[in-house]
Amino acid sequence: MIRPRTALAAVGLAVLAAALWWRKNPSACPYGQRFWVEAPHPFITRDRLADVLEPATGERILEIGPGTGYYTLHLADAVGREGALEIFDIQQQMLDHTMRRVGEHGLSNVTPTRGDATSLPHPDDSFDAVVLVTVLGEIPEREAALAEIKRVLRPGGRLVVGELFGDPHFQAFGSLQRRCAAAGLSFEIRSGPRLGFFARFRA
């Protein structure tokens, strides 16, 4: 008979091994495991995102990796009918799921696009702001993605990145700041502890 402690230790080791493998092999959270992105987000709350992003009516915002729309509906409300929110994801199922929620809430200012964040299909200076929450670490070529984000941001546009410790692809604040600086994005503010924060950068 297996003792409870032994079983618990085995499960813990399996979870740790999976997390380490996932960290060494960056990839998007599969749609079949979407419960991870639908869970409550300590530290990186919707209200804190709004405080850091400071979205305004009429703005054009790009959300990369919306998951199942945890932040999407609030972003769409914030920019209003005069604004536009584009959600961008490598997985069509995530986009479809989010757009169903958008329809249920009667929003008409959200547009989905499928693609790779290292090759954004948008003209230069397209957006007032770009948002990524627990997404940057899932992109194998992070430097290329940040360069693309800088390209599509209007001069003075904002990039807001959210990170949460415990995510297998967690990006520590210091590392994030260095990567953004190398891409030409200047750090402005951080809200939240280093274990869970939003950071804003300016193009």
Predicted regions and their residues:
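Class I SAM-dependent methyltransferase SAM/SAH-binding core
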Residues: L62-S119
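A short SAM/SAH-binding and catalytic strip from SAM-dependent methyltransferases
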Residues: D128-E141
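A short acidic, Gly/Pro-enriched loop at the edge of an enzyme's catalytic core
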Residues: T118-V130
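Conserved alpha-helix/loop element of class I SAM-dependent methyltransferases that forms part
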Residues: P40-T57
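Conserved class I S-adenosyl-L-methionine
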Residues: V160-A183
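Core SAM-dependent methyltransferase catalytic element
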Residues: G192-A203
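Hydrophobic alpha-helical topogenic segments used for membrane insertion/localization
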Residues: I2-W21
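A short glycine-rich, Lys/Arg-flanked "PGG" loop and its adjoining helix->strand segment in the class I
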Residues: A76, E143-R158
